[in-house]
Amino acid sequence: IGSEGTLGIITELPLKLIPAPKETISLIIPYENLEDCIATVPKFFMNHFQPQAVEFMEKEIVLASERYLGKSVFPKQVEGVDIGAYLLVTFDGDSMDQLEELTEQVAEIVLDAGAVDVLVADTPAKKKDAWAARSSFLEAIEAETKLLDECDVVVPVNQIAKYLTYVKGVSEKYDFAVKSFGHAGDGNLHIYTCANDLDEETFKKEVSEFMADIYKKAAELGGLISGEHGIGFGKKGYLAEFAGPVNMRLMRGIKETFDPKMILNPGKI
């Protein structure tokens, strides 16, 4: 597990099934800025709330989703405050009474931490709309650009805001657009570069420089260049610099030991 098929393949996998939750509830939590949004995330775990999902998204990606779906789900302004970022959080439990009590506790914590409001998606239709919007992000981006590339990194949760602020600053040097969202509970970020009017050659050149820069920053903050999508061919060129010569020699040595004929997923290490 984790070797991306370079050391072996899974031929049999026992799975343990657990009962589906009796009740679930989702909360849309809007913030004026990304910093307050991300700073709230550790408070869920410090207070033992145990969310099943904690997703963050910036306003730009939400707007793209709404243009794609033709439906508005997330508020853009609350009591005169312009919204810049959101958390979408899901909890499960044995009863709605339990979840309503939990929602009150969560609301007190997040509002004190800078949230502008807490919107409750407590019906099947509301939950479906909220998560349909979240699930549509990639399709929404693809619908609006002829060329795109993705950076899939992971950084410590307490470094997310700092990292994305850096990414936004670096992106201003280039002519493409950047849209981001991710799994705030574990620091896994999806950063998409969208070509706008750039031709393919220019876009690839600019994105290559941009990616090298932000991968380096992720490493400086204690992160990794791949959160969940793997290295593959796309990030192979960045792996050597990130891992360093010693780690690369170790990985190649392990590969040669277990797969001396280089049969399994060749050409990746």
Language-model features and meaning:
Residues I1-G227, I231-I269:
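Noncatalytic alpha-helical scaffold of FAD-dependent oxidoreductases
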